[in-house]
């Protein structure tokens, strides 16, 4: 069977970085002749791009792998691949656990898939987890959307948060050059994409590893400089970035977001805990007072800006009073969106070895209480939209109501309204908001806007 007759399927777990990696690997496979299959059980190559941030995601991978391993006994020419963070963490141990695997590859090796696959097709079992310099990918990704796209700007993370496995599995920070990032965005603009999200595990660290400093001693290349550099890319209407770290978030960045017309008024800045002792134990490098100052400064420049974040409950040793400090921070700030999780011990992290682990019952109770408050505060934040006219970029049809389309406001609020997706996809539409929920809006279209800011 030639590659042009072979079908592939990729299942992606985890964060936006993983989704972007999967799109690049799909592009590589299609570049060498593979065809996409919606059904993994009909595919000749099955790739799981994995996440190890939470134990439940990791266990789900092993469940899926078990099914495909059985299938390989019936279909010996099936190529079975595990990529991503579980692959990096487990390495050769994965082959011992699932001997049917053909390739185990860490996230730094995503761009090398074609070369690694050649080794597999030559009859080898391959493990690629050694640290490498990430080279520019010349293969076009197979992107899920035709309207919005992710662009990686920095890989890896140099932080050492005591709960987080990311630095172990994604390696040290490696920034792409501004020229390479802009070139990719220019091509996306030419292809009709309207919105770009610049991605990094710690995007505020962008450029620290690139050569050059200014006369004042500042790094010559920063996220702020990058935003100014790419703001005028033709065809691109909106620019977002994620994920920010409070330790490196600057007022200069806020000013840039206010000044640059294409940069959306939405900030994703994880706080993880509202208690200073826990933040210190996590090695986050800031206090809750510093975090509040950042949010206050954003709202000073952009009062209507949307704020989203991440938070962990049940970190080892967390007392009820410390958890209530997190609740107080959420109450005081009022987030538009908050991604919450119960602490999950991860192999190779300091916190996993501590003897003051909390019970699953306590963690579950606190997670429910936090989520309840998050929904209340988000619903309160949504009220400000009622009756307003919002700019919405139409992305797709509403899968629950095919008479509606859906898109996002500049503040990243999911919005639904009646319309024909064939006419509106990729268009900026002014929508009058007639109904609000905690995390979504509904409205009526007012008019289609020009889709060229350049």
From Swiss-Prot:
Principal place of residence: cytoplasm
Location of the protein in the cell: Cytoplasm
Enzyme Commission code(s) on record: 2.8.4.3
Residues noted as binding [4Fe-4S] cluster 1 in the record, renumbered to the chain: 15, 51, 85
Entry keyword annotation includes Transport: no
Xref: PROSITE patterns: MTTASE_N, MTTASE_RADICAL, RADICAL_SAM, TRAM
Residues annotated as binding [4Fe-4S] cluster 2: 157, 161, 164
NCBIfam families: miaB-methiolase (TIGR01574), MiaB/RimO family radical SAM methylthiotransferase (TIGR00089)
Protein name: tRNA-2-methylthio-N(6)-dimethylallyladenosine synthase
Organism from which the protein derives: Gloeothece citriformis (strain PCC 7424)
Origin organism lineage: Bacteria, Bacillati, Cyanobacteriota, Cyanophyceae, Oscillatoriophycideae
